[in-house]
Amino acid sequence: NLIQLSNMIKCAIPGSRPLFQYTDYGCY
């Protein structure tokens, strides 16, 4: 789902780690 993916990316952006490390981080 692109909307869920977009939300996860928006959540990950404030972090300092690369996006690929947020695959199981997510926003729940």
Curated annotation (Swiss-Prot):
InterPro entries for this protein: PLipase_A2_dom_sf
Key word Disulfide bond present: yes
CC annotations in GO: extracellular region
Localization annotation: Secreted
Listed cofactors: Ca(2+)
Cofactor annotation comment: Binds 1 Ca(2+) ion.
Enzyme class: hydrolase
Entry keywords, A to Z: Calcium, Disulfide bond, Hydrolase, Lipid degradation, Lipid metabolism, Metal-binding, Secreted
Residues reported in the UniProt entry to bind Ca(2+): Y28
Keyword Transmembrane helix: no
Family the UniProt entry places it in: Belongs to the phospholipase A2 family. Group I subfamily.
Role: PLA2 catalyzes the calcium-dependent hydrolysis of the 2-acyl groups in 3-sn-phosphoglycerides.
Descriptive protein name: Phospholipase A2 pseudexin C chain
Organism name: Pseudechis porphyriacus
